[in-house]
A protein has these predicted regions:
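Core residues of folded domains in eukaryotic genome-function proteins
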Residues: 28-34, 44-48, 55-59, 83, ...
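Eukaryotic short linear interaction motifs
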Residues: 41-45, 57-61, 68-70, 101-105, ...
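C-terminal regulatory segments
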Residues: 67-68, 93, 127, 138-141, ...
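Mobile genetic element proteins and their domesticated derivatives, centered on retroelements
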Residues: 37, 52, 80, 95-98, ...
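Short coil/turn segments at secondary-structure boundaries
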Residues: 46-48, 63-66, 74-75, 107-110, ...
Length: 586
């Protein structure tokens, strides 16, 4: 056993390193993004993963124990610099690390030593923070959004933590209530969406005799109040209308997260996708509540300004499909007219800065600009009939492979820039691999041995996808079993599937939104109120005040996608919900 985890492991690691040559050698042509992220293992020790990501795949490079050091900018910067120097700093296009302040400072250290390397924040993390910002808008008129989420979370927590209530719920639903952690991407969207899916089951639960018996058996005033609050929420028509409304305007952010959460090189589409996301939100919110859209727009711009780097602008310009007449003719979401990327002043400033950063030699830069002018003006090889027809028919890299070689400098830059990723999800998926290998049952492994095991385990994943031997040799196929699963058939779920099970659910929001409200005779006499000053579009209020907080019945009809025939229940206010003011750590 000792030999297997020492000499044997070292030999296997060397074998994997040799096999990875077919991928790392391609970095000279395509460039590579160094992706890094930190976490804490089962021993409570801080670890930092470092991976190389390009169009050829994801290669695990190293993991480092930082238990003896603080995660300060100098230490992180030095760690990444060592990895750059090991693989060659001039094939590295960008480094993608966390958006935290110390990571940004580490990025500045890297850019200072190697001016040709870009620092980029993780797009998925940025979008997740954006969704958090939207839900937690602090303006008084929109604090109801955060209160709505807290109300839903309270209901989920009560049912799932109360075994008898949970048992009753399960008799009425095939789906579980999701207790989505704050660290999971798109947690707000997933929570609201699942609530909407199980709305009918929740209504059946609180209408059942079993629920009433359980509520009557509650011994303390606190428990009885908890049961009543859950029942009030389930039967509150305004609550469900507001959930649907919030889901509508955070759904574009969710889809943008799904778009960005990939190891594929999608950097050329980020600019346009962000514009489309904002336009979709505008189409949903602006006609009903221009002030809310103004607040959301400000949050989007703030996050984009923190993330946006010149490399994104250059990749946008080098994506041929955004110059095709068919794309330019389509109206953009939000009613904006589409135009060629390089004609946007912000994009132009960005791609010019990126070129100066990537090419330091003035003469080379002049040649490159001349070739770029031909591309933008559709001259030479870029003006042929086939080149124009294929702009939106093949991928960007295929297009450059077919038509870019007459302009070798621009071709090389396009292939290297368009091969890059936009997120650090690859590094985060190492957490699962590391936890399987270095679990509590195996915690006698030191960090070096655990790192070697992760190196072998993770990189076999890449080899299993692309090596011919892996298609016939079962030893390269079954390596990804869950080691804690006694049933080998069940344990063969890959770690990627385990990670993506929740986020990859089929989106049936449209069907859920069309679900009729529960038909039951239980209408509670009281319900928790929203904080003072909050005015959701659909509110249950009392004392002769309007039944709709903002807008009218027509507004309610547009927000729910149908006529507003469902009566709004009027109830006296009893208890105000507190708004969570906690900030997520960046």
């Amino acid at each position: 056993m000792t030999k297997a985890r020492t000499v044997g492991l070292d030999k296997e690691k060397a074998k994997i390193q040799n096999a990875l040559g077919q991928f790392t050698n391609a970095w000279n042509e395509y460039g590579v993004s160094i992706v890094s992220d930190g976490w804490t293992n089962v021993k409570g020790k801080p670890l930092i993963n470092v991976l190389g990501v390009s169009a050829t795949g994801v290669v695990f490079l190293s993991a480092h124990d930082y238990s003896d050091k603080f995660k300060i900018d100098n230490n992180i910067g030095e760690l990444l610099l060592k990895n750059f120097e090991a693989i060659g700093p001039y094939i590295v296009i960008q480094v993608i690390i966390d958006n935290a302040a110390n990571c940004k400072a580490a990025g500045a250290i890297i850019e200072d030593k190697y001016p040709n390397i870009f620092w980029s924040g993780c797009l998925v993390h940025t979008l997740n923070l954006l969704m958090h910002d939207i839900i937690k808008i602090k303006e008084n008129d929109y604090r109801w959004i955060g209160a709505l989420y807290k109300k839903g979370k309270h209901m989920i927590r009560f049912i799932t933590n109360h075994s008898n209530a949970h048992g009753i719920f399960r008799t009425h639903s095939k789906l579980e209530l999701l207790k989505v952690g704050k660290t999971r991407f798109a947690s707000y969207y997933l929570t609201f969406r699942r609530l909407l899916k199980v709305r009918e089951a929740l209504a059946s639960m609180v209408s059942s005799e079993s629920w009433q018996v359980l509520k009557d058996r509650a011994t303390s005033t606190f428990d009885r109040r908890q049961f009543q609050e859950v029942e009030d929420t389930v039967l509150d028509t305004a609550f469900w209308k507001n959930v649907k409304y919030v889901l509508q305007f955070i759904k574009p952010v969710y889809y943008m997260i799904r778009f960005a959460d990939t190891d594929k090189p999608v950097i050329g589409e980020v600019y346009e996708q962000m514009d489309s996301m904002l336009g979709q939100i505008k189409d949903i919110v602006d006609p009903k509540d221009p002030i809310l859209y103004k607040h959301i727009h400000a949050q989007v711009v703030k996050r984009w300004d923190h993330l946006n780097v010149p490399l994104h602008a250059l990749a946008y310009v080098l994506t041929p499909k955004y110059y095709s007449p068919s794309w330019l003719a389509k109206p953009a979401p939000g009613g904006m007219e589409r135009k060629k990327p390089h004609t946007d002043s912000e994009v132009q400033a960005g791609y010019m800065t990126a070129i100066d950063k990537l090419v330091s030699d003035p003469d080379e830069c002049d040649y490159l600009r001349s070739e770029l002018s031909k591309y933008l003006s559709e001259l030479g090889p870029f003006g042929t009939l086939h080149a124009k027809r294929d702009r939106d028919r093949v991928s960007s890299m295929e297009w450059w492979t077919m038509y870019g070689s007459p302009c070798p400098r621009l071709y090389k830059m396009a292939m290297r820039v368009l091969s890059q990723v936009v997120n650090s999800s690859s590094a985060e998926r190492c957490w699962s691999t590391y936890s399987f290998i270095h679990s509590v049952k195996r915690n006698r492994l030191n960090e070096n041995r655990a790192e070697s095991l992760v190196y072998v385990h993770y990189n076999l994943r890449l080899l299993s996808h692309y090596c011919e031997r892996a298609k016939t040799d079962r030893s390269y196929v079954t390596w990804d079993n869950n080691p804690e699963e006694h049933n080998l058939e069940d344990g063969s779920l890959t770690l990627e599937r385990l990670e993506q099970e929740l986020l990859g659910e089929e989106d049936d929001l449209a069907a859920a939104a069309a679900m009729p409200p529960p038909t039951c005779s239980l209408f509670p006499s009281d319900a928790p109120a929203l904080p003072s000053g909050s005015r959701p579009p659909f509110a249950s209020v009392s004392g002769g005040r309007a039944g709709v907080g903002r807008g009218s019945a027509a507004l309610a009809s547009r927000a729910t996608g149908g006529d507003d025939t469902t009566p709004i229940v009027h109830r006296p206010r009893e208890k105000k919900l507190e708004i969570s003011r906690g900030k997520r750590k960046h």
